[in-house]
Amino acid sequence: MADYIEINSERLCDCKKGYLSCVEAREWMKNQIGVWNFNYEPRDVRDKTVHPAVFPIGLATRVIEQFTHKGELVLDPFCGSGTTLVAAQDLERNCIGIDLKQEYVDLSNSRVDNEKNGNPCKQIAVCRDARTLSEV
C-alpha cells in the first residue's frame, strides 16, 4: 500500500476567483431553499443488502456542484457504495473515498471503473480509517 495518494486538485474551470462553485449565483441561492427531491436512476445502488446507507447519485451531485469547481478535490471519509465517487466522476471532480471495509472499497472502485467517461479527473477509494486522514 502506498504511503500517500497523489491526486490533482487544481480548478479546470474558468470561474472567477473567489466564487464558491461553478453554479451561477441565482441557481445557487435557489438550491439553498426548500426540500430537495431526487429520482433514482439505473446507476443508483438501491439495495440495502449491498450497503445500509445508500442514496441517489443526484444527492451527491447537487452537493458537489454547490460547493466545488471542476478539477477540485472531493473527500468522502465514509464512501460506502461509492455514490460520491460516481457523482464526482460525472462532474469532473477528483475524489478520494475512504471506508473501513475492503468489500465497500472494492464496490466503490468497480462502480467508478464501470462509469469511465474520459474526463481528466481521478476517483479512488481506499481502505483506511478516516480518523487517520493525515496518513492518506
What label would you give each PLM region?
Residues 1-136:
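Class I S-adenosyl-L-methionine-dependent methyltransferase catalytic core
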